[in-house]
Amino acid sequence: MVSIRPDEISAILKQQIEDYDKSVSVSNVGSVLQVGDGIARVYGLQQAMAGELLEFEDGTEGIALNLEDDNVGAVLMGEGLGIQEGSTVKATGKIASVPVGDAMLGRVINSLGRPIDGKGDIAASETRLIESMAPGIIQRKSVHEPMQTGITAIDAMIPVGRGQRELIIGDRQTGKTAIAIDTILNQADQDMICVYVAIGQKAASVANVVEVLRERGALGYTVIVAASASEPAALQYLAPYTGASIAEYFMYKGKATLVIYDDLSKQAAAYRQMSLLLRRPPGREAYPGDVFYCHSRLLERAAKLSDAMGKGSMTALPIIETQAGDVSAYIPTNVISITDGQIFLSSDLFNSGLRPAINVGISVSRVGGAAQTKAIKKIAGTLKLELAQFDELAAFSQFASDLDAATQQQLSRGKRLRELLKQPQFSPLILAEQVAIVYAGVKGLIDAVPVDQVVNFSRELREYLKSNKPEFINEIQEKKVLSPEAESVLKAAISEVVSTMVASAN
């Protein structure tokens, strides 16, 4: 018979009591009061933070936006079809963050940084908060380096610098996205990381952009953040902040980055939808009172960093869609006042065959002039004024029966300048080509070329310089200055091409 020794039993019990881990995991839990339209009202969650991530019973994630006396208003970042009244909600103690790193390049992700391109998981090196503070005054430097878009009209008259915020604004179908995509394509040899944020667009449009970038070899230095029209409003609202966070990672590593928000009108509409469903008081055009702050805190994250901060930069090209050219609506005026200039695209110019359809008279770059390269600044100084005057004269000449010789000459020059600035989509030009084209127009060297042949002249001149005068192209690309020697080479090349074209026309 086994003898039971009480002292051994008591010793074992004492040991087990001592080894017992008394730590208790405390989680902040609430229950769903009401759910629908992408919004949930949650009872409990007394310790919830503003902007905290919530986890619902069916796995759907949400963000706590309204912290009220007796409930929390949350927006759902998913369909939430499995959420039932009375089901539990857990506060995660985390604020929304996104994976960042070199592994993101070439990938298509959603607003939460999850891949949606079917290429598997992303092995990101670290994460960044979606919402983060913009660089302070001391951490910044004034914009002084050019960000070449490859579009002659912009680089010559509305130059954009690294670290600038330049708005692209216009009606639907006027070529806003085309300008943004051309700018990405032009960064191939500029050592720049690009982030394209598609907000509330058709999934087919986003797929088309991805395909264009892949075909032209631009996907390798680009990250695409997509929140298409079928996504919940919360994801459309978050998408621009996600794009900014990814670009910020590279900016603080000393890299030059470019972010395109296409477009912020749809983000504002998504934010309005969320706010109204959360019963926040509406303001002008039913937008909430803080919609200005929604855009200003996003665009202030674009900066040119000081030398001490690593010299990185983040250039922002926000896009806004207007209704019937009305730039005095609420969102357009807000974003115009936040940005450092705007490129205004006109549907009338677009329909008349001018592509890109930039209205030079009301487009402006407030800080880009300091960043413009000397070569193009030297020759393009009068270009914007001449085109603006041409627009006025063209309108006036429709009613005038006879015009003096000087006015006719100005109209003739203006027509040729406008033709010179036409540029097909997906064909950005290098600096040397832009210098040659603008020089030919501004100096009046193509006045003998028929207006309908100016586009052909532009192409012939570029081909002639590439094949016969590569030293001119190399000098402009390297030194960024139009020297007297280079100018004489260019003059000779232009006269050669013009004489050939005039002779063949006769």
UniProtKB/Swiss-Prot annotation:
Its main location: membrane. One of its GO terms (cellular component) is plasma membrane-derived thylakoid membrane. Disulfide bonds: none annotated. It holds the Pfam family ATP-synt_ab. It is a peripheral membrane protein. Gene3D superfamilies: 2.40.30.20, ATP synthase alpha/beta chain, C-terminal domain (1.20.150.20), P-loop containing nucleotide triphosphate hydrolases (3.40.50.300). Transmembrane segments: none annotated. Its EC number is 7.1.2.2. NCBIfam families: atpA, PRK13343.1. This is ATP synthase subunit alpha. The lineage of its organism: Bacteria, Bacillati, Cyanobacteriota, Cyanophyceae, Synechococcales. The gene is atpA.
